[in-house]
Amino acid sequence: MKIDILSIFPDMFSGVTGNSIIKKAIENERVEVEVTDFREYAEGKHHIVDDYPYGGGAGMLLKAQPIFDAVQAVKEKQPETKPRVILMDPAGKRFDQKMAEEFAEEEHLVFICGHYEGYDERIREHLVTDEVSIGDYILTGGEIGAMIVMDSVIRLLPGVLGNKDSAVTDSFSTGLLEHPHYTRPADFRGMKVPDILLSGNHAWIEEWRDKESLKRTYERRPDLLKNYPLTDKQKTWLKEWSDSK
């Protein structure tokens, strides 16, 4: 996969691409990440990327020209692909695990990170394929949002995680929150690991994990159960918890 990031603050991404899982993914050639300062594509002596909005109003808007030309330039480097051009914007579709899995199937992603009051509307109308938000709040720019999406997508790529099952069993990947985890020691200052996890009976352990996953979802994110295909056993557990309230 190739990921292009367009930002007027490219140095913000060095910490993400130079550490941990993403660094290893780049070193192992599972993904190529290139960060471009789209200010370099702005016309004129001073390379200005923003201007006042027509009709008045507060703040400055990112101009269409630098971003259009920067996107065209990164597309020309990968002429064999048809990239998803992703605009990070609070008005976009809420990012979730399903979207991460969808993006992970692509060959080429281009992230546009904005600043100031917003974008010239022609960028939305004629350039981007996706508008993505990481939540109902405002940040100073799109860079942090792009980092979140990029991290979530890269860890899903084949060969990136050491254990191929890690991404499959994560919270949200199964539709439920993940079950509790424990490691050694079995007794830490009187706080003990559930006996069933020490039993060695894999069938019991799997059932315990399934039940705890469902219980955690029921208690913390009941909205996720609305369209979840429950088994008969899971329905019985839910009824027990509901009746005990």
Curated annotation (Swiss-Prot):
Pfam families per the UniProt record, alphabetical: tRNA_m1G_MT
Alphabetically ordered keywords of this record: Cytoplasm, Methyltransferase, S-adenosyl-L-methionine, Transferase, tRNA processing
Subcellular location: Cytoplasm
EC number: 2.1.1.228
Top-level taxon of the source organism: Bacteria
InterPro entries in UniProt: Alpha/beta_knot_MTases, tRNA_m1G_MeTrfase_C_sf, tRNA_m1G_MeTrfase_TrmD, tRNA_m1G_MTases_N, tRNA_MeTrfase_TRMD/TRM10
A GO biological process held by the record: tRNA N1-guanine methylation
SUPFAM superfamilies with a match to the protein in the record: alpha/beta knot
Residues the entry annotates as binding S-adenosyl-L-methionine: 114, 134-139
Single GO term (MF): tRNA (guanine(37)-N1)-methyltransferase activity
Reaction equations catalysed: guanosine(37) in tRNA + S-adenosyl-L-methionine = N(1)-methylguanosine(37) in tRNA + S-adenosyl-L-homocysteine + H(+)
PANTHER family from the UniProt entry: TRNA (GUANINE-N(1)-)-METHYLTRANSFERASE
Known function: Specifically methylates guanosine-37 in various tRNAs.
Subunit structure: Homodimer.
Family per record: Belongs to the RNA methyltransferase TrmD family.
Protein name: tRNA (guanine-N(1)-)-methyltransferase
Organism: Listeria welshimeri serovar 6b (strain ATCC 35897 / DSM 20650 / CCUG 15529 / CIP 8149 / NCTC 11857 / SLCC 5334 / V8)
